[in-house]
Amino acid sequence: MCSEVTQHLTEDIIPFWKSLRDDENGGYTGFVGYDLKADRKAVKGCILNSRITWFFANAYTLLKDSSLLEEAAHGFAFLRDVCWDRTNGGVYWSVNHDKTPAETLKHTYNQAFSIYALSSYYEASGDREALDLAYQLYDIIEGRMRDGSGYREAFDEAFNEIGNDKLSENGVMASRTMNTL
């Protein structure tokens, strides 16, 4: 079974995600239709790019294929250079295909996924900059998103609390949910 899973990973899953790489604008394509056609001009979710970066970093750690580390480095560069808010800190919700911010809100869930990506990339590559950014996000979560009762979830780009409607598919809006840290 292990060889079957490894074969599926290396012959199907990894090539699929590699095919979504955007060398022109960075990161990975934000939308693929049911027909598997990528929309290269779609908005790019920073969570999606964090997850893809995490995936390639961990795939490299497992398989030791240098092309996987290069994919993780590509994702890391996109998180650092495009998704990162250089004025207020933290990671945007999404960016346009042309590298401009699409939705500038900051969500605790999104910051946490970026920590996963950055720490996994650091573990795979030894790139200290990734670890430093992960620590910066941790400090943001603890310093700006936490209050005396726990963690608030949704903020504008300057970390003023806003309505939390990003993770609810059923219309339930709450300042705290179980879908965070």
Where are these regions (language model features)?
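Glycan-recognition and catalytic cores of secretory/periplasmic carbohydrate-active enzymes
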Residues: M1-L181
